[in-house]
């Protein structure tokens, strides 16, 4: 490719709406353009990188026997209603109606569609297992799209689905996808971590996420260096001991005036007690009714864990105005005493350790002190429903180490669905004994457009993007520093022609602009290797420079073949993550 023919509208200025480095550099580098909030066009450079990512994904899918299909974007509402996800998925489901007033959604994921498709195809145990995938555009009505292509309304995703007659077969496929996903990240050339994950709105019994490590990653990851335990913040457990202090005597519960103190900090300060003595009461609401979650005052509730424990993905934090209307009290004074019986109370394990605690009194300006769980108020269920903290004990039995925290960007997630969808949609097969049984399923998602943003987020510097060679828009850039010098131009052309013939993805910057301008653009778009042909050509020397290194190397230029061999060797050893610290 000649830069003079390339449509790559690079920008010097940072976009005014930039909220993350990857968005800034993809815009400035001419890879993408914003159409509206969360909706982007991919320009030639951006689409070229996307296609290279897709190719790696396709090859790894084919290695494990997954066959490519294409499913519809528009999904009939009745299929989502069959599984209950029409309501449970929440407002992120982008719904629409046709001219006949029939309801549809733009697919964020395809479990219902693929299950409906296969229920009419797979009838006998002899037809299993089946492994299918697609790469397609998906839609999610994000409440606040942000971080560029990392959290968009419209995005490109690879989703795969496997169908089995038993769980042993499912486990085998799950491991195949686990290995394939690791291969994808390794082939792209990124630092990553695999973590235990919450199944969320997809559902199922078991899941792992694949995170690209990045300082500005949107996801928190907790891990143990000693035993290798790792989990997303939504799933992470700890080995903290929440035993009761047996030396402290139980006291009589008493209502006290706490005036205008509402928050945990205000109440603790007013009563001159530790936040660990307070029991935070949080009201949640779903289509199934009200839930009160209790947690120790110094911890934060983990909504994903509550949803998982109660098997209710529609649970959300209740609106304070709805709480006031329903219970006649502001959220700062709610508590489990005198709460109606139809409100389910779930308590974090940390509440077990609180003796003579402080809770809201369900009336304005009042709290109870010396309150004790199960003696003074009911609890329907104890469970782990909090976010862990860095420095807590590792949950692995016998490890005795502590958890550390880092940040990452989720690019892939795999799920063991079991019969979650097949049982609800009556997708059954006849087994060897003539009995009908529901399909056992797995699903496996990979965010193609998210990977684009994640790469840039991990690999960049003050000059621009540092693409790994596997997905770089070009592997090599040839830069003739003076287009009016015949020797420089002819040598550059000779090198360009040879590299093209040898199959190198190469660009020559043949624009009539200054050398400095060329260097800035080539660095901005992140080409791994630069071949700089300048005035030293008269001495038989040219410069090679790697994108991830500050200094270049002057080499003797004898012939194009020898230069090609040197560049090829540099490309083979090129690893911009080598000195990366995250």
UniProtKB/Swiss-Prot annotation:
GO cellular component term, pick one: cytosol
This enzyme's EC code(s): 6.1.1.15
PROSITE patterns documented for this protein: AA_TRNA_LIGASE_II
Main subcellular location of this protein, as a coarse class: cytoplasm
Catalysed reaction, written as an equation: tRNA(Pro) + L-proline + ATP = L-prolyl-tRNA(Pro) + AMP + diphosphate
Pfam family, one: tRNA_edit
Localisation per UniProt entry: Cytoplasm
Primary role: Catalyzes the attachment of proline to tRNA(Pro) in a two-step reaction: proline is first activated by ATP to form Pro-AMP and then transferred to the acceptor end of tRNA(Pro). As ProRS can inadvertently accommodate and process non-cognate amino acids such as alanine and cysteine, to avoid such errors it has two additional distinct editing activities against alanine. One activity is designated as 'pretransfer' editing and involves the tRNA(Pro)-independent hydrolysis of activated Ala-AMP.
Protein name stated in the entry: Proline--tRNA ligase
Gene: proS
């Amino acid at each position: 490719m000649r830069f003079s023919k390339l449509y790559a509208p690079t920008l010097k200025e940072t976009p005014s709406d930039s909220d993350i480095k990857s968005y800034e550099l993809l815009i400035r580098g001419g890879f993408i353009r914003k159409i509206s909030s969360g909706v982007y066009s991919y320009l030639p450079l951006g689409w070229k990188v996307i296609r290279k990512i897709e190719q790696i994904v396709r090859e790894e899918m084919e290695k494990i026997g997954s066959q490519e299909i294409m499913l519809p974007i528009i999904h009939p509402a009745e299929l989502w209603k069959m599984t209950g996800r029409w309501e449970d998925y929440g407002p992120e489901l982008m719904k629409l109606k046709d001219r006949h007033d029939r309801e549809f959604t733009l697919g964020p994921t395809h479990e219902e569609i693929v299950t409906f498709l296969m229920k009419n195809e797979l009838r006998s145990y002899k037809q299993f297992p089946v492994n299918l995938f697609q790469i397609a555009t998906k839609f999610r009505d994000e409440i606040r799209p942000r971080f560029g292509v990392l959290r968009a309304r419209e995005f490109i995703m690879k989703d795969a689905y496997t169908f089995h007659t038993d769980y042993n077969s499912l486990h085998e496929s799950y491991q195949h996808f686990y290995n394939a996903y690791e291969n994808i990240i390794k082939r792209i050339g990124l630092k990553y971590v695999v973590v235990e994950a919450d199944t969320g709105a997809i559902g199922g019994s078991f899941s792992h996420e694949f995170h690209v490590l990045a300082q500005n990653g949107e996801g928190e990851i907790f891990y143990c260096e000693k035993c290798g335990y790792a989990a997303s913040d939504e799933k992470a457990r700890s080995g903290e001991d929440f035993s009761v202090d047996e030396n402290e005597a139980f006291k009589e519960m008493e209502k006290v005036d706490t005036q205008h103190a509402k928050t945990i900090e205000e109440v603790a300060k007013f009563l001159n007690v530790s936040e660990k003595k307070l029991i935070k009461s949080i009201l949640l609401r779903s289509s199934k009714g009200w839930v009160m979650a209790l947690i120790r005052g110094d911890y934060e509730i983990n909504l994903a864990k509550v949803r998982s424990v109660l098997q209710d993905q529609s649970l959300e934090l209740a609106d304070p105005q709805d709480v006031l209307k329903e219970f006649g009290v502001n959220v700062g004074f709610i508590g489990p005493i005198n709460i109606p019986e139809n409100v389910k109370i779930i308590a974090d394990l940390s509440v077990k350790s609180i003796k003579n605690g402080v809770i809201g009194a369900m009336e304005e300006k009042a709290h109870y002190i010396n309150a004790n769980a199960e003696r003074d108020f009911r609890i329907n269920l104890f469970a782990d429903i909090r976010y862990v903290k860095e420095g807590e004990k590792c949950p692995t039995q016998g490890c005795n180490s502590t958890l550390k925290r880092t940040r990452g960007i989720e690019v892939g997630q795999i799920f063991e669905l079991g019969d979650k969808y097949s049982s609800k949609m009556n997708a059954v097969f006849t087994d060897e004994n003539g009995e009908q049984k529901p399909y056992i399923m797995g699903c496996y998602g990979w965010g193609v457009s998210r990977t684009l943003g994640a790469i840039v987020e991990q690999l960049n510097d003050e000059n621009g993007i540092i693409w790994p060679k596997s997905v770089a828009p070009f592997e090599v850039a040839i830069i003739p520093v003076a287009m009016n010098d015949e020797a420089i131009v002819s040598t550059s052309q000779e090198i360009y022609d040879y590299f093209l013939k040898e199959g190198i993805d190469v660009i020559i910057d043949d624009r009539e602009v200054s050398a400095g301008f060329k260097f800035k653009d080539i660095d901005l778009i992140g080409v791994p290797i630069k071949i700089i042909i300048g005035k030293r050509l008269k001495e038989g020397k040219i410069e090679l420079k790697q994108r991830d290194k500050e200094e270049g190397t002057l080499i003797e230029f004898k012939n194009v073949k020898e230069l090609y061999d040197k560049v090829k060797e540099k490309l083979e050893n090129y690893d911009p993550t080598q000195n990366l610290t995250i």
